[in-house]
Design a protein with these regions (language model features):
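A short, flexible helix-boundary coil/loop motif
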Residues: 133, 156, 188-196
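Alpha-helical scaffold segments in soluble metabolic enzymes
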Residues: 148, 152, 178, 182-185
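Acidic, contiguous segments within the catalytic cores of piggyBac-derived transposases
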Residues: 133-134, 139-141, 177, 184, ...
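Polybasic low-complexity intrinsically disordered regions
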Residues: 1-111, 117, 175-181, 189, ...
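Residue-level marker of positions within ordered structural domains that often coincide
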Residues: 59, 158, 184
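Helix-centered, glycine/charged polyanion-binding patches within enzymatic domains
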Residues: 88-89, 94-168, 172
Length: 196
């Protein structure tokens, strides 16, 4: 078990999501795109595909939960699905603002470390901004660990586009890819333990 080897501490979770593109072409037998995939806008760019929501252990960087949804599903709606329930701290970006006030999180006794939106920091008075920026920078350094599994899956494993039709098959493949990403993340720790 990962807990026994010190690979999973379960004191805190970093939550994030990424969009994985699906083929948007209609040049197939059905003359249609995958009906389970949806399009969404991120900034001014439109994407068609699904979203991979993950929960990552703060101490080790190991992915403990993966949830796949259509791309148009809001990140905050899947937060409860990627928390394991035993964490003391939750770290998330500004897309999860207000998660601590949602009814599914009322009974959770955790410290919510959710980023403040950039516009709110810019609009605040200079003295308050000078206090908030170093705190936000420190929280961003913790949240940066959640990007490592995404880097491994999308860049090292080159999973930038979905290969199957439907959410079930693609989510199953994401579970496999993130499990393999966990092996890459803990490779040095496992090698040291095997030599001892």
């Amino acid at each position: 078990m990962p807990e026994e080897g010190g690979l999973l501490i379960r004191q805190g979770t970093i939550v994030d999501a990424t969009i994985i593109a699906a083929p948007s072409s209609t040049k197939n037998k059905r003359k249609a795109r995958d009906p389970e995939m949806h399009q969404t806008r991120k900034g001014n760019q439109w994407h068609f595909g699904m979203t991979a929501h993950i929960g990552v252990d703060v101490a080790s960087g190991v992915v403990h939960t993966v949830k796949g949804t259509a791309a148009n599903e809001a990140d905050i709606n899947q937060m409860a699905a990627v928390l394991h329930g035993a964490e003391e701290d939750v770290f998330a970006d500004a897309g999860y603002t207000g998660a601590d006030k949602r009814p599914e999180h009322e009974d959770r006794d955790v410290c919510w470390n959710i980023a403040i939106k950039r516009g709110i920091i810019k609009a605040s008075p200079k003295g308050l901004r000078d206090l908030a920026e170093p705190v936000e920078r420190a929280l961003a350094q913790v949240r940066a660990w959640v990007e490592h599994p995404f880097h491994i899956v999308k860049n090292l494993f080159r999973h930038k586009k979905l290969r199957y039709r439907g959410l079930a098959k693609n989510t199953a493949q994401l579970h496999t890819l993130f499990a393999l990403a966990n092996l890459v993340i803990v490779k040095k720790t496992l090698l040291v333990q095997s030599r001892a």
